From Swiss-Prot:
Family in the record: Belongs to the DNA polymerase type-A family.
Name of the protein: DNA polymerase I
Example GO molecular function: DNA binding
One protein family per Pfam: DNA_pol_A
Function in brief: In addition to polymerase activity, this DNA polymerase exhibits 5'-3' exonuclease activity.
Catalytic reactions of this protein: DNA(n) + a 2'-deoxyribonucleoside 5'-triphosphate = DNA(n+1) + diphosphate
RPE1 insert domain residues: 439-486
SUPFAM superfamilies the record matches: 5' to 3' exonuclease, C-terminal subdomain, DNA/RNA polymerases, PIN domain-like, Ribonuclease H-like
Domain 5'-3' exonuclease as annotated: residue spans: 1-283
Length: 921
């Protein structure tokens, strides 16, 4: 990549922190955390391979205060300390550079940026080329003909066009612009309410921060002039803080930075000491050395399947698990009933049949008739020194719901696979490892799968008998009883035997795809929190729901009488076939169109709404009938039946792996779809109440998806609006309808809101026209004006569609891959493109709120509060708090939700309290 005499300057701690958050929390053979060390080593090896530098240096901060702290004591004061498992690795990162023979540069009182600036400018002055390896925006100030910036996150050189696109100015003016904007991550104040667009405009006009303050009377905006006047000192201090010192007193000798290959024995010892086996091959190829001690990572051979039927056998298994330090475990269920524990250890599977198949969450005690094994298994699950590998963790958490200790050191293959491939069918994920079947794990065990398939059934039995002939103790298929039907579980046992191998494979794959932090920091911890939420549930007023059901029922009967009167006959309104015949044959109404796949007429909402627009009253009655019957059947009739007899609360189930974006879903019952936009929907929400002595608290992210769009698509106009705390829907309405604020009506703002959120979902002119009840031409003009006002949105959409088409997926702010498998389907391409546009936004929203949930759970536990999280509804969290904790928890919720991630725009949370869910909306 580089020319012969190019100097490569590597931002050391920038790489280390990136490595920490990109890699899994690995441990060395001694049990020390080494994930950041591993990632740092891997990155340096890649740089050597890609750049083949003659001169190179890794530059480190010295730590402690530097000259910027004396200018501004609050500099970087808002930064939290690094995670503990990273702190212990920091003293060792220099060993990584040393073992790879990288020269190291650092000096007390100076940041790495200043040392990089010094060596870069001095080397460039000699006519040599410099490449700075960093994702730090501050270093963009150094860009010149001889100094290039290579962003390792994006794998590309940063160009002046990139700088202009992001900051609205060229690199030589970046210091001036950033002094006005400030830097939230470094606690550099800047000037309030000035974003990139305004800052670049001011610098274009005046040339520098100093010139602005020397010519304040020439600033046209009175508001800006006043803001600048009040922030003069902050802006000038920011200018000093952002600038780089290119005259650090260090011995500058380019020849001292010449790289030569490392000592092979020293490097081998280092890689072996920390257990970096997966780097052996790369090091061997790069440095032409030989490293012994290669070990096969995956061994799919299953030698035995045994049944454990007594305590002594299980105790022996536990002893072996303690020695080895890792085992597989799976709770086999069918239709919610617990059938067997399947354990695995060193290619052997062990089956423990469960005699009590009750799956009621609160009446079921894990012991009951299973005293001989339940405590032993739980002690293994709670042992921090033994790693457990499972698939679908929540059933295990529920089985041991009444235990006082927590399950620890457990990994979930299902969540690992989801972090790697959200949006892809889960049924294929075990295919390569198993070489036998590509159906979901939970379905592999059942004999009903072989029903009518003699060849497959025979093959399954033959496989078991072949095992027996080679020494296996499984003479016949192992079975457990489900009702009166035996279920074969040999196939499940074979899969569980592969858990450890699959885990090791997934670790490497997660690392290679930079997805481990998604799994370890978000998906795995949120599983425990969702389990807690499911156990807590939410209280529902059954008597009120019964009363509401009666009310709905009475109106439904009245509607039916009116429908029958208008149609002239009685019929089954719920039968689409009968309804179509009545409307379009008997009554001869227009718009009758037979469904393409059926002989019946189409009677969907679109047809009924069209009839309503043309004055046919029966259509209004039918729409109302459908609305009420759905509410009655889905909520007022069914919710009381789903109230638990012991807790007197409703307990939904949250699904983590059912969406393409990382979004959670809810089922049995679905409490994320409780209607809100109708008076009847609000009546149903009134049934969700706080326990006596408690209040419900709703914490709702405000316009979160538009804020995310402004950040990931870098939309200056949107950013500025959010920074200024402007009403974004009002701003959009003014632009779209060419009106001043005082001229706007509620209808204008409603339409602007529909446009703002419709664009996020890739809405077409046709779809928008229908939603706003305007012509296609008007809707098309609205979209055109929107793209003109918010420059960059259309470009983001086109780039996202192109990326999805080329790669089959898109990524969110956190790097989660959201796969779009239908992107090349001719019939569904437009749908897939809309999904691709929205997935990074919706996925980022989903991960932001999950991070907030994790942080809130930790804070509630830390403070020993009784407040509990009961529901998550996409961008809303619903809490139940004791009345005396409400004033304590509200500021905690607000702070954590608003600061769980760092974006270019503020994240705002709206909080309301009440006795029921309706009151807080």
């Amino acid at each position: 990549m580089t020319q012969k005499n190019t100097l490569l300057l590597i931002d050391g701690y920038g790489f280390v922190f990136r490595a920490y958050y990109a890699q899994q929390p690995l441990t060395s053979p001694k049990g020390e955390p080494v994930g950041a060390l591993y990632g740092f080593t891997s990155m340096l090896l890649k740089l050597l391979s890609d750049f083949k530098p003659k001169h190179v240096a890794v530059v480190f901060d010295s730590g402690g205060k530097n000259f910027r702290h004396y200018i501004y004591p609050e500099y970087k004061a808002n930064r939290p300390p690094p995670p503990e498992d990273l702190i212990v690795q920091l003293p060792l990162v220099r060993d990584v550079a040393s073992n790879l023979n990288f020269p190291i540069l650092e000096k007390n009182g100076y940041e790495a940026d200043d040392i990089i600036a010094t060596f870069a400018t001095k080397t460039a002055a000699l006519g040599e080329n410099v490449v700075i390896i960093s994702s730090d925006k501050d270093l963009l100030q150094l860009m010149s003909e001889n100094i290039k910036i290579y962003d390792p996150l994006r794998g590309k050189y940063i160009t002046e066009d990139d700088v202009v696109k992001k900051f609205g100015t060229t690199s030589d003016k970046l210091r001036e612009v950033m002094a006005l904007i400030g830097d939230r991550s470094d606690n550099i104040p800047g000037v309030p309410s000035i974003g990139p667009k305004t800052a670049s405009s001011l610098i274009t006009q005046f040339g520098s921060v100093e010139n602005i303050f020397n010519s304040l009377d020439q600033v046209s905006s009175v508001k800006q002039r006043e803001t600048l006047q009040n922030s003069r000192e902050a802006a000038l201090i920011s200018w000093q803080l952002i600038g780089l010192d290119s005259n650090v007193d260090l011995d500058f000798q380019l020849n001292n930075l010449e790289w030569s290959p490392p000592n092979s024995d020293k490097l081998t010892g280092f890689l072996q000491e920390y257990g970096f086996r997966s780097l052996y091959k790369r090091a061997e190829n790069l440095f032409d050395i030989k490293i012994n001690d290669h070990k096969d990572i995956v061994d799919n051979k299953v030698t035995e399947i045994k049944e454990i039927s007594n305590k002594l056998e299980l105790e022996n298994f536990a002893k072996d698990a303690e020695k080895i330090g890792i085992f597989g475990i799976y709770l086999l269920q069918h239709k919610g009933d617990n059938l067997a524990f399947i354990l695995s250890l060193q290619n052997q599977s062990y089956i423990i049949k469960i005699s009590n198949t009750s799956h009621d969450l609160f009446s079921y005690n894990a012991k009951n008739n299973n005293d001989w094994f339940s405590d032993i298994i739980f002690n293994l699950l709670a042992d921090k020194s033994i790693k457990k590998i499972t698939y679908s963790l929540k059933p295990l958490l529920k089985f041991y719901a009444n235990q006082s200790h927590e399950i620890t050191a457990i990994e979930d293959l299902e969540l690992m696979q989801y972090a790697l491939s959200a949006g892809l069918s889960q049924k294929n994920l075990f295919e390569e490892a198993l070489k036998e079947d590509n159906r979901p794990l939970s379905k592999l065990a059942y004999r009903e799968e072989f029903k009518g398939d003699t060849e497959r059934s025979t093959a399954a039995y033959k496989s078991v008998r072949e095992d027996a002939s080679t020494g296996s103790t499984s003479k016949l298929p192992l079975e457990v009883e489900f009702g009166k039907r035996p279920i074969v579980i040999n196939e499940s046992a074979r899969i569980v035997a592969n858990f450890i191998s699959l885990y090791k494979q997934n670790i490497l794959e997660l690392k290679d795809n930079k997805a481990f932090r998604l799994y370890s920091d978000i998906d795995l911890p949120i599983c425990f929190i969702l389990d807690k939420m499911e156990k807590v549930g939410i209280k529902v007023d059954a008597n009120y729901l019964k009363q509401l059901s009666t009310e709905f029922g009475a109106e439904i009967l009245k509607l039916e009488e009116e429908i029958f009167a208008l149609s002239g006959t009685k019929f089954n309104i719920g039968s689409l076939k009968q309804l179509g015949e009545i409307l379009f044959e008997k009554m001869q109404l227009p718009f009758g169109k037979a469904s393409a796949k059926a002989s019946s007429y189409s009677t969907g909402a679109e047809i009924l709404e069209k009839l309503s627009e043309h004055g046919y009253n029966i259509a209004d009655l039918l729409l109302r009938w459908r609305q009420l019957t759905k509410l009655k059947n889905t909520y007022t009739d069914s919710l009381p039946k789903q109230i638990d007899n012991i807790t007197h609360r409703v307990h939904t189930t949250f699904l983590q792996t059912s969406t393409t974006t990382g979004r959670l879903s809810s089922q049995e019952p679905n409490l994320q779809n409780v209607p809100i936009r109708s008076s009847e929907g609000n009546k149903i929400r009134q049934a969700f109440i706080a326990e006596e002595g408690y209040k419900l608290i709703s914490a709702d992210y405000s316009q979160i998806e538009l804020r995310i769009l402004s950040h990931i698509a870098n939309i200056d106009a949107l950013k500025q609006a959010f920074i200024n705390k402007d009403d974004i829907h009002t701003q959009t309405a003014c632009q779209i309808f060419n009106l001043q604020k005082h001229e706007l009506t509620n209808e204008h703002r409603r339409k602007a809101k529909a446009i703002n959120f419709g664009i996020i979902y890739g809405i077409s002119a046709f779809g928008l026209a229908k939603q706003l009840n305007v012509t296609n031409g008007e809707a098309s003009e609205y979209i055109k004006k929107y793209f003109a006002e918010y420059k960059g949105v259309q470009e983001y959409m086109e780039q996202t569609k192109a990326f999805a088409s080329s790669n089959g997926y898109v990524t969110n702010f956190f790097g989660r891959k959201c796969f779009v498998p239908l992107i090349h389907d001719k019939k569904l391409k437009q749908f897939a493109e809309r999904a691709a546009i929205n997935a990074p936004i919706q996925g980022t929203n989903a991960d932001i709120i999950k991070i907030a949930m994790i942080n809130l759970d930790q804070e509630i536990e830390k403070r020993k509060l009784k407040t509990r999280l009961v529901l998550q509804i996409h961008d809303e969290l619903l809490f139940e708090a004791p009345i005396d904790e409400v004033e304590i928890i509200i500021p905690i919720i607000k702070k954590i939700m608003e600061y769980s991630t760092n974006m270019d725009v503020p994240i705002i949370t709206e909080i309301r309290t009440g006795n029921n869910w309706m009151e807080i909306h």
